[in-house]
Swiss-Prot record:
Catalysed reactions, as listed in the record: (2R)-3-phosphoglycerate + ATP = (2R)-3-phospho-glyceroyl phosphate + ADP
Residues that hold substrate according to the record: 24-26, 40, 63-66, 122, 155
Name of the protein in its database record: Phosphoglycerate kinase
Similarity comment: Belongs to the phosphoglycerate kinase family.
Pathway this chain belongs to: Carbohydrate degradation; glycolysis; pyruvate from D-glyceraldehyde 3-phosphate: step 2/5
Organism listed in the record: Synechococcus sp. (strain CC9605)
GO MF assignments: ADP binding; ATP binding; phosphoglycerate kinase activity
Enzyme class: transferase
Keyword Transferase among UniProt keywords: yes
Enzyme Commission number, as recorded: 2.7.2.3
Cellular component aspect of the GO annotation: cytosol
Length: 401
């Protein structure tokens, strides 16, 4: 069901109004507490700037890390407020706590167009328990709710779901709207042929998404460590590669389902092997039918890259979730980088390319190709759950369009 968006609210609706905006500012920090990647902060700027422009009082709510319901000084949002202030070119006040006297005082002192960042909502255990009393206090700071935190939309927490019971309208921000448009659109109404590339080390974490994609796609390409569970299920020798022994039957079922559905399910034909799990390991390329004992597969091989490129050539929509190998090690990054380059080229030819969150986003950014893709999802678990066809609580709670 389509959701009401911030675009439906004009300056007349928002000027002078206190607007609670749930954002995803869970950014990586280094040892000195400096932000190493501000992508998530930048991703929220269109929504924040739109609200400032419409004269709203912008109250931002976010979580950071996993403080387990207790105040943890290392997980305060102080560096985030400083970076956001630089990006907006205006001061951003930060509260000492997300509810209580300090938050009320700082919100009460706001002028139209001001921005306040509430302290980490997860300092309260009630946030993750979606406790109604806590949600009501948080909502009590505002009059309108905007959810722009797609990365947290698969959680029914107080700041993503509970507050909507006390604030109307409750609408999707621009980032949330774009995520839903691309990810839901790709699964529900794709331009075909539709291909999905699924990587990563474990079948167990991608079962739901593989199962759904085999129902929806024309082609499914599988890479990453999970391929060895499929090979072992076929009776092949995989050396000391990663295998989930308890998922062998499932791998057989997924292959059988693809065949029954007339879906092209492609696994690599060759792999790059290492003698141990290290960036400087000795390596060799082998056909999947000839993996020697004592070696482990850490990337897809050159022949597989060609096969995958040929399969993708005529596709109009491609969803990619999960790397082809251990791309963190340069020696085993070729498969992942080649797929990234292929998708960038396809984008240039009018194919809709969607990078579905998680490690594939890091891989595309590392390859310097992020700008070339149609859409890069900011969600990890949320992207997977949406692609699985699950209802996300943070989305379901918003007003209907």
């Amino acid at each position: 069901m389509a959701k009401r968006s911030l675009a439906s609210l004009n300056a007349g609706d928002l000027s002078g109004k206190r607007v609670l905006v749930r954002v995803d500012f869970n950014v990586p920090l280094n040892d000195t507490g400096a932000i190493t990647d501000d992508t998530r902060i930048r991703a929220a700027l269109p929504t924040i700037n739109d609200l400032i422009g419409k004269g709203a009082k912008v109250i931002l709510s976010a979580h950071f890390g996993r403080p387990k319901g207790q105040v943890n000084d290392a997980m305060r949002l102080t560096p985030v407020a400083a970076r956001l202030s630089e990006l907006l070119g205006k001061p951003v006040a930060k509260t000492d706590s997300c509810i209580g006297p300090d938050a009320e005082a700082k919100v009460g002192a706001m002028a139209n167009g001001d921005v306040v960042l509430l302290e980490n909502v997860r300092f309260f255990a009630e946030e993750e328990k979606n406790e109604a009393g806590f949600a009501e206090k948080l909502a009590g700071l505002a009059e309108v709710y905007v959810n722009d935190a797609f990365g947290a939309a698969h959680r029914a927490h107080a700041s993503t779901e509970g507050v909507t019971k006390f604030l109307k309208p409750s609408v999707a921000g621009f980032l949330m709207e774009k995520e839903l448009q691309y990810l839901q659109g790709a699964v529900d109404e794709p331009k075909r042929p539709l291909a999905a590339i699924v990587g990563g080390s474990k079948v167990s974490s991608k079962i739901g998404v593989l199962d759904t994609l085999i129902d929806k796609c024309d082609k499914v390409l599988i890479g990453g460590g999970m391929i060895f569970t499929f090979y072992k299920a076929r009776g092949l020798s995989v050396g000391k590669s990663l295998v989930e022994e308890d998922k062998l039957e499932l791998a057989k079922e997924l292959e059988a389902k693809a065949k029954a559905n007339g879906v092209q399910l492609l696994l690599p034909t060759d792999v790059v092997l290492a003698d141990n799990f290290a960036p400087d390991a000795n390596s060799q390329t082998a056909d999947i039918n000839a993996i020697p004992d004592g070696w482990m597969g850490l990337d897809i091989g050159p022949d597989s890259i060609k096969v995958f490129q040929e399969a993708l050539a005529d596709c109009q929509t491609v969803i990619w979730n999960g790397p082809m190998g251990v791309f963190e090690f340069d020696k085993f990054a070729t498969g992942t980088n080649s797929i990234a380059t292929t998708l960038a080229d396809l984008s240039g030819k009018g194919c809709c390319t969607i990078i579905g969150g998680g490690d594939s986003v890091a891989a595309v950014e590392k390859a310097g190709l992020a700008e070339k893709m149609s859409h890069i999802s900011t969600g990890g678990g949320a992207s997977l759950e949406l692609l699985e066809g699950k209802v996300l609580p943070g989305v379901a709670a918003l007003d209907a369009a």
